[in-house]
Amino acid sequence: MKCLVVLTALFGISTASFLGCNLSPVWGVKNAYRSGLQTYWCPPGLKFDPFGCCCDFPFDDLVEDLAGLLGGAGNGGNGGGGNGGNGGGGNGGNNGNGNGNNGLKKYETCYDC
């Protein structure tokens, strides 16, 4: 779907032809709209007109984005020390740090229908 949206944006074709723009609000979930089986999320503060603006932001990805907004993933654990060399005891290897991704993504652009 992401590829499709990028292509439509590049060639100036409205996403309406793919989404149908038949969006209806999702009860109990602010800024969420449903089109068929897919749910879309419109970023807060953006004026959303079901017949004039389609936000191509699958609601399924919202959980990941919220996790990123709330602090992101923690740092990866340190690697274990290396094995000592044979004969005399060797020094332990350095610990390796691994930073986790914060999972924060920007909202997709809102397309005119």
Curated annotation (Swiss-Prot):
<feature type="signal peptide">
    <location>
        <begin position="1"/>
        <end position="16"/>
    </location>
</feature>
<dbReference type="GO" id="GO:0005576">
    <property type="term" value="C:extracellular region"/>
</dbReference>
<keyword id="KW-0964">Secreted</keyword>
<feature type="region of interest" description="Disordered">
    <location>
        <begin position="81"/>
        <end position="103"/>
    </location>
</feature>
<keyword id="KW-0732">Signal</keyword>
<protein>
    <recommendedName>
        <fullName>Uncharacterized shell protein 10</fullName>
    </recommendedName>
</protein>
<feature type="compositionally biased region" description="Gly residues">
    <location>
        <begin position="81"/>
        <end position="101"/>
    </location>
</feature>
